[in-house]
Amino acid sequence: MARIAGINIPDKKHAVIALTSIYGIGRTTALDICAKTGVSAAVKISELSEKQIEELREQVAKYTVEGDLRREVTLNIKRLMDIGTYRGLRHRRGLPVRGQRTKTNARTRKGPRKPIKK
């Protein structure tokens, strides 16, 4: 297994799909990385040479991925909560942040139903 950005990339998958196993890299970014390195998107990771894998590593290193990206997102949410914005309050209360209705639905965000105590 090739190791890129601290993640074991699956050998049996095509390069584009394998790169998406890194947090912060989706299909579009993976296609861009493959295009910049000259690696065909259809080739499997196991068929790549060590030089090509090193080029992929260098390209991925230019993006904010994995731990750094997770930390950045967490700090952004924490900042919203600290300055008291509406979005921050919704995060703090565990409710939908982007304007979805909460009278019905929103169960994923609110969690399981709590019985009404009489």
Swiss-Prot record:
GO cellular component term, pick one? cytosol
Q: Which InterPro entries match?
A: Rbsml_uS13_C (IPR027437), Ribosomal_uS13 (IPR001892), Ribosomal_uS13-like_H2TH (IPR010979), Ribosomal_uS13_bac-type (IPR019980), Ribosomal_uS13_CS (IPR018269)
Q: According to the UniProt record, where is the region Disordered?
A: 91-118
Q: What is the superkingdom listed in this entry's lineage?
A: Bacteria
A GO molecular function assigned to this protein is: rRNA binding
Gene3D superfamilies from the xrefs? Answer: 1.10.8.50, 30s ribosomal protein s13, domain 2
GO BP, one annotated term: translation
Q: How does it assemble?
A: Part of the 30S ribosomal subunit. Forms a loose heterodimer with protein S19. Forms two bridges to the 50S subunit in the 70S ribosome.
The similarity comment for this entry is: Belongs to the universal ribosomal protein uS13 family.
Its function, per the record, reads:
Located at the top of the head of the 30S subunit, it contacts several helices of the 16S rRNA. In the 70S ribosome it contacts the 23S rRNA (bridge B1a) and protein L5 of the 50S subunit (bridge B1b), connecting the 2 subunits; these bridges are implicated in subunit movement. Contacts the tRNAs in the A and P-sites.
NCBIfam families listed in its UniProt record: uS13_bact
- Protein name as it appears in the record: Small ribosomal subunit protein uS13
| Gene label | rpsM
